[in-house]
Structures are given as C-alpha cells and as structure tokens.
Amino acid sequence: MAFGIGDLHWRGRDGRGRSTWSRGWVLAGLALLTAAILAFHRQVPDEIGNFGSLMETFLPWFGLAVPVLLVPALLRRSATALAALLAPTLIWVMMFGSLLTDKSGGGYDFTAVQHNISATNQDVGSSMDTLMQAKPDVIALEEITGAQLPAIRQKLDGAYPYHVVEGTVGLWSKYPLTDTGPVDIKIGWTRALRATVDTPNGAVAVYVAHMPSVRVKFDGGFTANQRNHSAEALGEALTKEPLKRVLLLGDLNGTMNDRALAPITMQLRSAQGSAGDGFGFSWPSTFPSARIDQIMSRGITPTSAWTLPETGSDHLPIAAHFQL
C-alpha cells in the first residue's frame, strides 16, 4: 500500500467532518493539565497523603507526557493538540532546561563525597574504594551499622585520619575536625551531626544528615510527616549556624523540588543545580529516578557536581568540587 505526502495534509476533515482545529480536544486538555501541574505544583494539596510532595519528588518526569501525547496528536493531525503541547514543553524547559547543560568549570580546592552506604551493604570495603576514587577531602556516610564500621575505618582511617560518627551517620576528613556533635532532628535517635572542618583555607561547618524515610502506602499515601518535621529541625539548626561557610551532605529523602524541604533548600543551594551536568539522579541505584541525596552549600562556590559509580547500596554516591 503506497503512502504519499498527500496523506499528511492537515487541512482536510476527518470522517466526522471535523477540521484539524476541531479534533484532539481530549489530547489538548491532557496537555494543558500537564502544564498546570508543572506550573502550579506548589498549589497541589498536601493534606491528603502528602500527594503534593510525592508529585514533586518525580516532577521532572512529568515532561514525558509531551512525547506521549505528541504521537497521538500527530496521528490525529490535531493542530489544537499540538498547540496545547507547546505549554507544557515551554514550562518544562523553563523549569528544568538548565539542568541539561554542563555548568561545571573553574578551579577548586575542596571536594566532598556523600553516600548512603545502606545497612544491607555486604561489601563496604569496595564501596569505600569507589568513594576514594574521587579524591575527596571529606566523605559523609549515612546508614552506618556497627558491623560495617570496622571495615569502613580500615579503609578510610589511613587517608582520612579525622572522623566523627554519631548514631548512624559519620564524617571522615583529611583535615582536623572540631566542635563535633549530634544535631537533634526530632526523631528520637541520632541521624545528623555537625563538625567544623579546619581546612587550609579556613573553617567550614559541615552537616551530615539522614532524613527519616518516606513510604508510599495504598491506604496512607506518601507518609512523610516525620521527615517533614526533621527538615524543619535541621533548617532551624542551619539558621543558627554561626559560620559563614556551610556544607550539607546527606540523604534527605526528598528532592530540591519538594516543598517539605523548603526550610533547608531556601537557605542553601544545590551543587548539582549550580554546577552539575544533568539531573544527577541518585536513587534507586538500579534505575536512578530521583535525586534524594544532596550536596548543598552556603558561602562557598560549587564548581562541579556528579554521581559516582554504583556500589553495594541502593543509592548512588554523589560528589562535588568547591572553591572555598
């Protein structure tokens, strides 16, 4: 059966007598709904199952609606649907387009690595080798177990003689650590710490944090209330931080788009967003779909950010260069 260019014309009417502008209204409606979700995601209510936060965790993926709707729009030869698709396309590009460009560049004098090593990681020694390949000045770890700690110390203590462990989080450093201690994030046990890293270029306050986990439940929605309260507590600690140069390394169990992390994200900037290349998704490691692991700063300049190769964890390690 021959297929000619005439079959692609848009000026004719379909079998129901509809023109290119009078068909495809359902597709157009779906396109405009996608645009509205992207543009007004902060207005999506969070009261029922924290649905707004759940949606914001995977917000970049809403852009996939554009190619999905584009195919039937072309098959229907609907000018209305195609015109409507311009809205979510432009909004998505304005929101996330800058993440697709490589923003790295410039010199650096400080490197940080962040990793949730996973309590079920059976080969933490190999994981530490992966982290050290980035030649970091500090390494932050979360979900450390008592059984894992000896193997971690065996790998790291030689190159990183200064370290502090509080509960299930730890920080290893090439430079002396002072003023170390736990940070209360209101969960009843220790999953955050603070330390001053005395670098050759001055002191940097480093926070390591592991926000409470979130769950998606059929009967309860996105259960994130405990994490949200912890974000408020950590945000308060950051507000009271006396040092001008601040670095936060952690598994925040939320993305930069998540409104619940605003007490933190309004004070600090993302290294990936400022100096990375791409979205830098870090979880799950088998098919990274969201960046819930963060390196964020205030008073220091990120010059590069990237993800490291997969380890035995369900999270990818992340790294960043800084100019102090």
Where are these regions (language model features)?
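Soluble catalytic domains of enzymes that build or remodel membrane lipids, polysaccharides, and related
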Residues: 108, 112, 121-132, 143-324
